[in-house]
């Protein structure tokens, strides 16, 4: 069967650069590697074909011979004289370092056949606004995996010890022959630990770790907000084979407040006032996180008017000046009027008839309406 053109195999032009050749080969090698296509003869042949093409075209002298004589220039069995293209002369280490590093190691992180770091944990901490602003210390209970005290984390029954895995010799990896290449994979017997337990611990069933509710004290600094994380180093799950424990990340969630809304270091609230206070002005008390303060309302205040109380917000957790408290006025319409109150309001309304100087917004609005209908 005639061989395909090597450039065609890799899917590149004849003038392709070294980088383009390498990129094309990596793509094909990942696609057709036997470990990704077990039992697929077509994929195995495509993998071999890509290897052969790259082995020739990545070597400048072999590529020159191939460009001049074709397959005859690199295949001694076809009779030309540029030298053979045996597989043993190719160096694919740079390719494999990029393409198959995770693939060969079974996709597992950490050291082979040794200690493994424990997993990190996440805990959501619910806080009131006052606790978040002032800081607090809370006690939490976290379900986690801790080192088994019965076997000291070895997984073996007390008085015994794990033995070296006879399949991998204790390194946690085995070599598998895949076509022209020797591929390193996680040992299927010990699952990468390098050790075997013939008599497992009865408490942890050979795992070296047991489930436990861990009680921890968490110091919350002043100024934290929803989404902030507090890291407790070493308070995550215990490691295996003597590996270090992971970390615990306490994620803050601040509950909604009945009065205040928070935006960064600033606080916002709505202050309801009577229409009499809005018209005549006055002074009222408003709440802050530090206690009550007096707020002066000027006469003629409208709904939506915002007053700023400087420094009455939140001091940021990372330092800096405290924010402000923004008080937005809402003028309330009176309800459930008495007879006398209704009479007084009727009398008041009568004094406004035909006089728009007391309601500048209404005056402008009605003038706009007249113009609108006049244009229509």
Curated annotation (Swiss-Prot):
Binding site for Zn(2+) 2: 165, 168, 187, 190
Residue positions binding Zn(2+) 1: 148, 151, 201, 204
Recorded family membership: Belongs to the DnaJ family.
Pfam family, one: DnaJ
Keyword Zinc: yes
Zinc finger (CR-type): 135-213
Cofactor binding: number and manner: Binds 2 Zn(2+) ions per monomer.
Keywords: Chaperone, Cytoplasm, DNA replication, Metal-binding, Repeat, Stress response, Zinc, Zinc-finger
Molecular function as annotated in GO: ATP binding; heat shock protein binding; unfolded protein binding; zinc ion binding
Function as written in the Swiss-Prot or TrEMBL entry: Participates actively in the response to hyperosmotic and heat shock by preventing the aggregation of stress-denatured proteins and by disaggregating proteins, also in an autonomous, DnaK-independent fashion. Unfolded proteins bind initially to DnaJ; upon interaction with the DnaJ-bound protein, DnaK hydrolyzes its bound ATP, resulting in the formation of a stable complex. GrpE releases ADP from DnaK; ATP binding to DnaK triggers the release of the substrate protein, thus completing the reaction cycle.
InterPro entries associated with the record: DnaJ, DnaJ_C, DnaJ_domain, DnaJ_domain_CS, HSP40/DnaJ_pept-bd, HSP_DnaJ_Cys-rich_dom, HSP_DnaJ_Cys-rich_dom_sf, J_dom_sf
CXXCXGXG motif repeats: 148-155, 165-172, 187-194, 201-208
Name the UniProt record assigns to this protein: Chaperone protein DnaJ
PROSITE patterns: DNAJ_1, DNAJ_2, ZF_CR
Domain notes: The J domain is necessary and sufficient to stimulate DnaK ATPase activity. Zinc center 1 plays an important role in the autonomous, DnaK-independent chaperone activity of DnaJ. Zinc center 2 is essential for interaction with DnaK and for DnaJ activity.
Cofactor(s) required, per the database record: Zn(2+)
Domain of life: Bacteria
Ranges where the J domain occurs: 5-70
Cited CDD domains: DnaJ, DnaJ_C, DnaJ_zf
HAMAP family according to UniProt: DnaJ
């Amino acid at each position: 069967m005639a061989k395909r053109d090597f450039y065609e195999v890799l899917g590149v032009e004849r003038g392709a650069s070294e980088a383009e050749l390498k990129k094309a080969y990596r793509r094909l090698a990942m696609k057709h590697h036997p470990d990704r296509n077990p039992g697929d003869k077509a994929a195995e042949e495509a993998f071999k074909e890509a290897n052969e093409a790259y082995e020739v075209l990545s070597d400048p002298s072999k590529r020159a011979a191939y460009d001049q004589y074709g397959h005859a220039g690199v295949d001694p069995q076809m009779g030309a004289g540029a030298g053979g293209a045996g597989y043993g002369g190719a160096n694919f280490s740079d390719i494999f370092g990029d393409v198959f590093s995770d693939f060969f190691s079974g996709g597992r992180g950490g050291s082979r056949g040794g200690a493994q770091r424990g997993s990190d944990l996440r805990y959501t901490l619910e806080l009131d606004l006052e606790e978040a602003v002032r800081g607090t210390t809370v006690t939490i209970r976290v379900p986690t995996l801790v080192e088994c005290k019965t076997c000291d984390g070895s997984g073996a029954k007390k008085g015994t010890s794990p033995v070296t895995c006879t399949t991998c010799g204790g390194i946690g990896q085995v070599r598998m022959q895949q076509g022209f290449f020797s591929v390193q994979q996680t040992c299927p017997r010990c699952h990468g630990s390098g050790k075997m337990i013939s008599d497992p611990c009865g408490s942890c069933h050979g795992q070296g770790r047991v489930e436990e509710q861990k009680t921890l004290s968490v110091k919350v600094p002043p100024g934290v907000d929803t989404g902030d994380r507090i890291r407790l180093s070493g308070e995550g799950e215990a490691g295996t084979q003597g590996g270090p424990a992971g970390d615990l990340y306490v994620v803050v969630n601040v509950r909604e407040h009945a009065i205040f809304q928070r935006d960064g270091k600033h606080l916002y609230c709505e202050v309801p006032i009577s229409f009499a206070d809005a018209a005549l002005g006055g002074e009222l008390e408003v709440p802050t996180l530090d206690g009550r303060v007096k707020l002066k309302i000027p006469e003629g205040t409208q709904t939506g008017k915002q007053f700023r109380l400087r420094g009455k917000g939140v001091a940021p957790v990372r330092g800096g000046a405290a924010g402000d408290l923004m008080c937005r006025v809402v003028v309330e319409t009176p309800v459930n009027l008495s007879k006398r109150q209704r009479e007084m309001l009727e009398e008041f309304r009568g004094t406004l008839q035909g006089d728009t100087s007391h309601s500048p917004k209404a005056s402008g609005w009605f003038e706009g309406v007249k113009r609108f209908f006049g244009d229509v």
